[in-house]
Amino acid sequence: MVNLRNAVHSFLVHLIGLLVWQSDISVSPVAAIVTDIFNTSDGGRFKFPDGVQNWPALSIVIIIIMTIGGNILVIMAVSMEKKLHNATNYFLMSLAIADMLVGLLVMPLSLLAILYDYVWPLPRYLCPVWISLDVLFSTASIMHLCAISLDRYVAIRNPIEHSRFNSRTKAIMKIAIVWAISIGVSVPIPVIGLRDEEKVFVNNTTCVLNDPNFVLIGSFVAFFIPLTIMVITYCLTIYVLRRQALMLLHGHTEEPPGLSLDFLKCCKRNTAEEENSANPNQDQNARRRKKKERRPRGTMQAINNERKASKVLGIVFFVFLIMWCPFFITNILSVLCEKSCNQKLMEKLLNVFVWIGYVCSGINPLVYTLFNKIYRRAFSNYLRCNYKVEKKPPVRQIPRVAATALSGRELNVNIYRHTNEPVIEKASDNEPGIEMQVENLELPVNPSSVVSERISSV
């Protein structure tokens, strides 16, 4: 036990030395200890950096820390902010979990492989496990974005059906399906690797997936097919949003199913004739004003909100596309042109492109911060250690009061908190009165404030 503790201590000291020490400092005893440890286990070898400090390794450590921390903030925000409790943000939280696990389990071991010149320094049975985790979390990220794009399109195309079946339970079921597909793609890797080590080792030293058939099939299933679905659904989403916005802008709405266009025109014409006969002296300005009031402002605001959300998700999708496309394209080319391509160049490109893909896991929280006010405020509070959940002010019940409204449209009721007596303001004496019961009102208690309520009399 003492020897194991000393070995672990020596390894950690030496790992820090790999990151910050210069080569002219004498650390040969520590290097010799760690070299002996790995030489006795798996024949690994240590290559000490030459000349200057290993700044690339330090930058990778910073990327790992930012990836883990940023995605933890996303998970906290969706968990604690009630405004973020919807299906899309549940998907984003699950995506953040996958990205956080990339930073915890995949990126550190990849950094370790870089520090040892891509010679696997750990026990050999851990190599297929690490590759499987890499494929699992990367595939999960892609599948989450694909599921989000499909969910957004359905929500915009059929909002009534989507809202009817879009509960928290349904969202969790969809997320479970995404993870099940990702696990199904990654599970064969440890099975293949433990049976035949040549499938996960190159030159018996470098831990990398070395099965051409699995590389081809896995790349298409885990990346290119979901990518095609995302591109199509995102284009359709933009098309539907633009069409709905244009229809509302010109005062048209989509006709309900089962009603013909002639029937709608007839109804509109009859309605217009009745209004003209009932109000022959109504001026043209009043008609225009009514037409503007009938325009569904709430629907237009909802479309604007959907457009903003689609913009943020589109940026996430575009960043993901830019980050992962080089790796998967190079991965396919390395298999298809195995004899004609320069394999050493392909290996170097893959080593660079895979880290560009890893960086994508840390960029998503930055996108949310820049383009979403709720996430930005939540992140700011959490970084200042402010985890308090906003509570609603206490409510107080106002006694039931009967009132007669003399206005055919609205009734203004001023309630003074220090007396609890409603004061009714008559809007007009020219229109017939409508008897109305004012029900119990629950309003926040604030003795120094005066609350003015506008209550519809219909």
Curated annotation (Swiss-Prot):
Residue intervals on the Cytoplasmic side: 81-86, 152-167, 237-311, 371-458
Superkingdom in the source lineage: Eukaryota
Gene3D superfamilies: Rhodopsin 7-helix transmembrane proteins
Effect of V354N: Decreased binding to inverse agonist ritanserin
Subcellular location, record wording: Cell membrane
GO CC terms in record: dendrite; G protein-coupled serotonin receptor complex; plasma membrane; synapse
Compositionally biased residues, Basic residues: 287-297
Region (Disordered): 274-301
Tissue: Detected in brain.
Outcome (variant: G218 to A/S): Decreased binding to inverse agonist ritanserin
Motif NPxxY motif mapped to chain: 364-368
Function summary: G-protein coupled receptor for 5-hydroxytryptamine (serotonin). Also functions as a receptor for various drugs and psychoactive substances, including ergot alkaloid derivatives, 1-2,5,-dimethoxy-4-iodophenyl-2-aminopropane (DOI) and lysergic acid diethylamide (LSD). Ligand binding causes a conformation change that triggers signaling via guanine nucleotide-binding proteins (G proteins) and modulates the activity of downstream effectors.
Protein name: 5-hydroxytryptamine receptor 2C
The organism of origin for this protein: Homo sapiens (Human)
Source lineage: Eukaryota, Metazoa, Chordata, Craniata, Vertebrata
Name of the gene this protein is made from: HTR2C
